[in-house]
Amino acid sequence: MNEDLIAEIQALSAIGSEEKFSEIIRLLKNSTLELRGKKNPDLQLSASALVFKKHKLFFIEHPYQKELLLPAGHVELGEKPLETAIREFHEETGFSASESGKLVDVNLINIPYNKIKNEKEHQHIDFRFLLELKEKEAGLAELPFFLLDRTEAPDEFKKYYQYKR
């Protein structure tokens, strides 16, 4: 059911974090429910965009968790994670990114209970893509966004600055 996703992760596992990727692959293999489109209340797919502008990475302030995160969102039915990363980056920041990207990481994220949406605690398998900024001027952004250098970024994301060009 999730063979395409597993193949993408297996290509990444050759460059590190084999234990982490093995756990994610196990979850994908054992999942009998659709992971796209929030169909599964326990495990869902998401995708994040890593986009640099002048050596600074884009972050958004998450509306419920009130923390700085990469622009990201749920993978919709019929959508591939790369398409999600591109779409969410545009929606959340108002900027556009290239339609090609490089998968650089996959993470299992524990999502806390959301009392505003009445969503129970669950997990996301988050695909993180390095994208190139296409437009220098932003359109309408859904969320406040920030351009941060490595010293300003949350610790979890500092490792991604190795990809800046």
Swiss-Prot record:
Its EC number is 3.6.1.-. It comes from the Bacteria. Mg(2+) binds at E88, E92. Residues 42-165 form the Nudix hydrolase domain. The keyword Methyltransferase does not apply. GO terms for biological process: folic acid biosynthetic process; one-carbon metabolic process; tetrahydrofolate biosynthetic process. GO terms for molecular function: hydrolase activity; metal ion binding. Keywords: Folate biosynthesis, Hydrolase, Magnesium, Metal-binding, One-carbon metabolism. Pathway: Cofactor biosynthesis; tetrahydrofolate biosynthesis; 2-amino-4-hydroxy-6-hydroxymethyl-7,8-dihydropteridine diphosphate from 7,8-dihydroneopterin triphosphate: step 1/4. InterPro entries: NUDIX_hydrolase-like_dom_sf, NUDIX_hydrolase_CS, NUDIX_hydrolase_dom. The keyword Hydrolase applies. A motif (Nudix box) lies at residues 73-94. Its cofactor is Mg(2+). Belongs to the Nudix hydrolase family. Monomer. Probably mediates the removal of pyrophosphate from dihydroneopterin triphosphate (DHNTP), a possible step in the pterin branch of the folate synthesis pathway. This is Probable DHNTP pyrophosphohydrolase. It comes from Lactococcus lactis subsp. lactis (strain IL1403). The gene is folQ.
